[in-house]
């Protein structure tokens, strides 16, 4: 359910305007990251660049934690019908994809 506010490097409204992702969906992703002890969640791809289309998927990369549970629940328990493409950075990742994540990624959550 969409409640609460997002605490992110970007202001809430700025994040929504750039990515087109509702504040509540970002908050749900953050809560799942905390639940499954994920260390870091990065938004990348067209939504991070701001050149997404209405039905563009949400590309996420993450490090640490219980990745299988996190990936499954993000797909099943967030308040959006958009598809997710989720990359586990603790597994082998193509160099080009890793460069793209590092270049354009927006950190949504980082455990301190």
State the predicted function of each range:
Residues 1-40, 48-54, 63-112:
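Catalytic core of pol beta-like nucleotidyltransferases
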